[in-house]
Amino acid sequence: VVDLSHMHHKLHAACAFYRSGFETATAVIVDGAGTFIPLNMERGENHMVFELETIFDCKYPFEIKTLYKHLGGNGPYRSGYDLEMSSEQYDESGTHECIITDGAGITKVYEAVTNYCGFQAIEAGKTMGLFPYGKPNKGIPPLFTDAGGEWTCANRHVTIPTYPNSSRINEDRFKFLRTPKDKKWGVDDLTVLENRRDLAYAVQTETQQQVLNLILDAVERTGNKNVVLSGGYGLNCVANYFYLDELNKHGIKLYAEPISSDAGTAIGAAYIAHHQITNSEKVLPFADSLYLGPSYAYDDKEIGHLADTYGATLEK
């Protein structure tokens, strides 16, 4: 048994890279909570932090090099900017740039709004579907802050991280976000409320812009305009079409991995093991199918036989 759980984001990157058809690529991973990483912070305090967003430089046969990583946790602790962290824990030589914050990552902000709208955190697709019913609203505070212009992070006044599972909207702090008292404990569908719809609009537009900024930063770092995207936020198909339009202006090609869920990490692990063993530099073709398992085909004769066996009536 080979345990690769210490490189969760790298497995996402491998899945996307080896299925993209690109010979080399810039990988951008935007995830809820990747590898759990214990860190000894200030005053000797131990904190658990998590992979949030990562940039990789990918080449055959199996060079997937970490360039940048955003780690986050519940805190509180002082944020660290422009840190040089050892890449040894990801089975790499050298170092990479790292930012550590005590706030939610891009995906966790989306999950917080998903919970606020009355859904389970894993049902972010429903928030994506609610987004077009909302509109810009000045009563909603910015979901991200620019930290003095040096880097952008989640606005902790709005989103309270509860790692490793989900996050929460600090709704009582902001008048517009509060749930009406007559609705709080009795409403069956929170999505009928204006504040839910408008916050769904805000989180979709703001998070997809954050990811676009990250992609452009990643391309600037690598100089490679072949981009692969994965991690939980990669399942946001509304955002993916937004990137296609925007990246086309910069001559950037995008492959958004359809298996961006954690199911893709198992595929990525298999790809890494295969290339480490074979050292093959053969560029794999673009993956044009999601159906990777065994195929099953039935004809009318077989179905009829099963119907006879169980005394069923076959209707065409």
Residue ranges and their predicted role:
Residues 1-316:
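Short acidic/glycine-rich loops and adjacent helix/strand connectors
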